């Protein structure tokens, strides 16, 4: 068996990626979230496949087909809530994964990092089009508001959002194409995830100390396969508690009402995992400026490798940047809270301050703290 896995053309790839892969001996549980994201993706694809068997992408029957899945299909309620809450678990793992990458300086592996940003954007797009499919009030109005932002793009904006809508409003054509996008995008994510792994295995994993670990590596199996299995078990435990005890806690009550173009909800907001970006969008009074800030709130992650001037890898021995990092995390939580609040004083002012702080920390404070720490080393 050992000879087979080392010589067989297909098994050799698996062997080099998951069995004999040399891995730093000191990587902590923060490195588990990559495998948890893989698990989340598998859960989403499988549950999504079964949901697609019963769902109809037509404005007249979409809402009732979701109700039919929950009421009449065997374990349909379980599949639907696994899919809906699985998306939340996916984003929790994604945010922690990116946060760990920033804290431990994984952005120096620039190819892996940039593919990760593409994965992040693709996952956000998938979640957005998926949120529209149940065709509830918040689904419809969320789709209308967010796609309408494309009209802010100079020259081509008007044509672009009419093309995405498939008409002059969000209607049957929009729902049909969003369903098609939602079906195909997870497979594109899976392909990008393989490329992400390919680039990671070219350079080898980072580790918590930020030091070179070539002299102290162990095989991935059985050490980290066991560790990953424990992480997957804990993820499934949390997901099942969420699904079986609090299935609607992360949803929006407005989505229990069928979509009605003549009745606008009091407060249109996306799912919780988009609220930080939505708060940044709303904090700028100009439409085009808001859209640019929204896009930059994610694309600014690509600036980390470019702005990194530190002589040390990661934040483990950098107390000044550690403080700034945790302020950044707190600021993100404030943005998430503001995104779910109505557009009125004092929430608008807090949102504007938090948005400025978000960009200032990445562009100004972290590079300045890098310079300060580099000078401290020289003392």
From Swiss-Prot:
Residues that coordinate or bind heme b b562:
83, 182
Against Pfam families, the record matches this protein to:
Cytochrom_B_C (PF00032), Cytochrome_B (PF00033)
> What protein name is recorded for this chain?
Cytochrome b
The entry's free-text remark on the cofactor is: Binds 2 heme b groups non-covalently.
> Can you list the GO cellular component terms from the UniProt entry?
mitochondrial inner membrane; respiratory chain complex III
The record's section on PROSITE patterns has:
CYTB_CTER, CYTB_NTER
Which residues are listed for heme b b566 binding in this entry?
97, 196
Subcellular locations according to the entry: Mitochondrion inner membrane
Q: Which gene encodes it?
A: MT-CYB
Molecular function (GO) terms for this protein are: metal ion binding; ubiquinol-cytochrome-c reductase activity
* Keyword check for Transport: yes
Family matches, as SUPFAM superfamilies = a domain/subunit of cytochrome bc1 complex (Ubiquinol-cytochrome c reductase) (SSF81648), Transmembrane di-heme cytochromes (SSF81342)
Which residues are recorded as binding a ubiquinone?
201
Residues that span the membrane, as ranges: 33-53, 77-98, 113-133, 178-198, 226-246, 288-308, 320-340, 347-367
Q: What does this protein do?
A: Component of the ubiquinol-cytochrome c reductase complex (complex III or cytochrome b-c1 complex) that is part of the mitochondrial respiratory chain. The b-c1 complex mediates electron transfer from ubiquinol to cytochrome c. Contributes to the generation of a proton gradient across the mitochondrial membrane that is then used for ATP synthesis.
Please give the cofactor(s) recorded in the UniProt entry for this protein: heme b
